[in-house]
Swiss-Prot record:
Gene giving rise to this polypeptide: FBXL5
Residues bound to Fe(3+) 1: H15, H57, E61, E130
Subunit structure comment from the entry: Part of a SCF (SKP1-cullin-F-box) protein ligase complex. Interacts with ACO1/IRP1, IREB2/IRP2; the interaction depends on the [2Fe-2S] cluster. Interacts with DCTN1/p150-glued.
Stated name of the protein: F-box/LRR-repeat protein 5
Region (Hemerythrin-like): 1-159
SUPFAM superfamilies, alphabetized: F-box domain, RNI-like
Organism for this UniProt entry: Bos taurus (Bovine)
Length: 691
């Protein structure tokens, strides 16, 4: 019978595990053939893993037991300052790196046995002292309920750290296991043949169909999948099935939480204490010098735990990027890196490049910058994205929003329902209305054949996304030559471009007028796109006229129920046809069955104080954000009411209840929007911080 009630005995259970490990390494030490290099290295690797667990055990005791006891008793100090764990780990590392031959192995073995014997003589009495001396003191200074809570935390920490370490080993050994399986393939096949001769009737789990195995694997968490991948080549391939890796939560996994379901069940804002803990981890990790020999005597237990967790998180992220995502990246739908201590812009960039079909991306309170989105370099490369949370990402600027807007793609209806502006720069002559040639007219009112002999050099693919284009460089786009007496109202015409109409709406712009707004594309856009991405996903009609009354001054809007005969318009020979039907100018009733871009439902830029009106207006390109319901711009200090209005006008589904922006801005929906969420917030930008 234990001397203390089991539910409050904080030492016995963890110490049982430590004593078990001591027995295991003593047994291995006695059985190892130090003349054999494989046996020698296997022992050192096993010892290294064992002593890492010893060190983690001591750190947990420091933080959750001894640290609390020191707060209530002044007689406790330097309990773990005399241990030799770091020295032993250094000894194992030197053996693995420096010992090269049998002679050195035998000399090293002598030193190893002496050091292990000395450590064991100190370590076992050390644990006995904790059980016989410190447990009674805990009973004296803590209540029964407090001790129950302490024990629960101690056991949970031991389990989570052990599970995380096993996951990391699984990730790193994934490819190594495959190589070993290939090496033993023939011997295994030979053995299987012999077993089949003995009992042809027997059926094991290895004979189950792949679809059944994948169904079984779907009940496993990431750690268990990594273990299964090491069983055989077949299991390794099945463990890389994309459907098993749809939802990734590396930050949670590094802390022992193996949830891998849809993100909707995790959409809860953490309390400020939890956020502070994650920020402390991040700061400790950044300050930590990887080359330093950190010992419990040099670092507080709390700081050591924080560094260890951040290190695990970093290794786990590297494991995912190099060993998992190259195989399953296209199937990943959810990536949650919120409050990560170790993630970098480079890591995010690599992950986004490997996961083109993301629907849910959460980078809340991470230290990323605009470069994290460099992999979103072509139009529509992540057009399935529905949820994007960049709350607290203070380094994000308009540059990132330009890349994000480009990645969201272009609405099919937006692309097909607008005028096609010219995409080439005129070098020597200007285009005239008389140059227009019609070759055929269909019900969809397509302008089939338009070109110009004086086409200049190609414009850079990203140009329309990065800066406004001055109309001084080129002239008006092609327009229909219609009866000037039948003019339509300008505001009616603005509505027409958002819906299908039977008659044809035509806009003739004043050639020398340029809207001063950086996000207004009422001006012409140069450059017929020749790259594959542009030809597949968009063309100039995506950049709609802004609809501002003041920028449309001098514009003649006309309607007509039928198109004139080509002879009425043509004065020159027919020109060469454009390459693709998709690039033609038309306005009609054609609609796509399903939108494939700009389906964003949730966008949070809370605390991204470097965002300006330009960044907001970039989001209105390509058809705006027609499905957006939740928009959080709390703490975006430099945006104005005009910029907000431009964005909101491109978000017809926006719910005022989930629309947040600074209370000091006189913006849209001022009476019904929810205001700023960052008031007196300790960890996100706000104009009233400190009040």
């Amino acid at each position: 019978m234990a001397p203390f009630p089991e539910e409050v005995d904080v030492f016995t259970a963890p110490h049982w595990r430590m004593k078990q490990l001591v027995g295991l390494y003593c047994d291995k030490l006695s059985k190892t053939n130090f003349s054999n290099n494989n046996d020698f290295r296997a022992l050192l690797q096993s010892l290294y893993a064992t002593f890492k667990e010893f060190k983690m055990h001591e750190q947990i005791e420091n933080e959750y037991i001894i640290g609390l006891l020191q707060q209530r008793s002044q007689t406790i100090y330097n309990v773990h300052s005399d241990n030799k764990l770091s020295e032993m780990l250094s000894l194992f590392e030197k053996g693995l790196k420096n010992v090269k031959n049998e002679y050195e192995q035998l000399n090293y073995a002598k030193q190893l046995k002496e050091r292990l014997e000395a450590f064991t003589k100190d370590f076992l009495p050390h644990m006995k002292e904790e059980e016989e001396v410190f447990q009674p003191m805990l009973m004296e200074y803590f209540t029964y309920e407090e001790l129950k809570d302490i024990k629960k935390k101690v056991i949970a920490q031991h389990c989570s750290q052990k599970d995380t370490a096993e996951l990391l080993r699984g990730l790193s050994l994934w490819n190594q296991a495959e190589e070993r399986q290939k090496f033993f393939k023939y011997s295994v096949d030979e053995k299987s043949d012999k077993e089949a001769e003995v009992s042809e009737q027997s059926t094991g789990i290895t004979h189950l169909p792949p679809e059944v195995m994948v169904s079984i694997f779907s009940y496993l968490n990431p750690q268990e999948l990594c273990r299964c991948s090491q069983v055989s080549t077949k299991w390794s391939q099945l463990a890389k099935t994309g459907s098993l890796w749809k939802h990734l939560y590396p930050v949670h996994w590094a802390r022992g939480d193996w949830y891998s379901g849809p993100a909707a069940e995790l959409d809860t804002e953490p309390d400020e204490e939890w956020v502070k803990s994650r920020r402390d981890e991040s700061r400790a990790f950044q300050e930590w010098d990887e080359d330093a020999d950190i010992d419990e005597s040099e670092e507080s237990g709390e700081e050591s735990i924080a560094i260890s967790i951040a290190q695990m998180e970093k290794r786990l992220l590297h494991g995912l990027i190099h060993n998992v995502l190259p195989y399953v990246g296209t199937s990943v739908k959810t990536l949650v890196l919120a409050y990560s201590s170790a993630v970098s812009s480079k890591m995010v960039r690599q992950i986004l490049e490997l996961c083109p079909n993301l629907e849910h991306l959460d980078l809340t309170q991470t230290d990323i910058s605009d470069s994290a989105f460099d992999s979103w370099s072509w139009l529509g490369c992540c057009q399935s994205l529905r949820h994007l949370d960049l709350s607290g990402c203070e380094k994000i600027t308009d540059v990132a929003l330009e890349k994000i807007s480009r990645a969201l793609g272009i609405l099919t209806t937006h692309e097909s329902g607008l005028l096609k502006t010219s995409t080439s720069k005129v070098t020597s002559t200007t285009w005239k209305n008389k140059d227009i040639t019609m070759q055929s007219f269909k019900q969809s009112a397509c302008l089939h054949d338009v070109t110009n002999k004086d086409i200049g050099e190609e414009v850079d693919n990203e140009h329309p996304w990065t800066k406004p284009i001055s109309s001084d460089d080129f002239t008006s786009p092609y327009v229909w030559m219609l009866d000037a007496e039948d003019l339509a109202d300008i505001e009616d015409a603005v509505e027409w471009r958002h819906r299908n109409v039977e008659s044809l709406c035509v806009m003739e712009t004043a050639s020398n007028f340029s809207c001063p707004s950086s996000a207004c594309y009422s001006k012409d856009i140069v450059g017929l796109r020749t790259s594959v991405c542009w030809q597949q996903h968009c063309a100039s009609p995506a950049f709609a006229y802004c609809g501002h009354s003041y920028c449309c001054t001098g514009t003649a809007l006309r309607t007509m129920s039928a198109l004139p005969e080509s002879s009425a318009l043509c004065r020159k020979a027919p020109r060469t046809r454009l390459l693709r039907e998709k690039d033609l100018i038309y306005s009609g009733s054609e609609k796509s069955d399903q939108e494939t871009g700009r389906v964003l439902l949730f966008l949070s830029l809370s605390g991204c104080y470097q965002i300006t009106d330009h960044g907001l207006r970039v989001l209105t390109l390509g058809g705006g954000l027609p499905y957006l319901e939740h928009l959080n711009l709390s703490g975006c200090l430099t945006v104005t009411g005009a910029g907000l209005q431009d964005l909101v006008s491109a978000c017809p589904s926006l719910n005022d209840e989930y629309f947040y922006y600074c209370d000091n801005i006189n913006g849209p929906h001022a009476d019904t929007a929810s205001g700023c969420q960052n008031l007196q917030c300790g960890f996100r930008a706000c104009c009233r911080s400190g009040e």
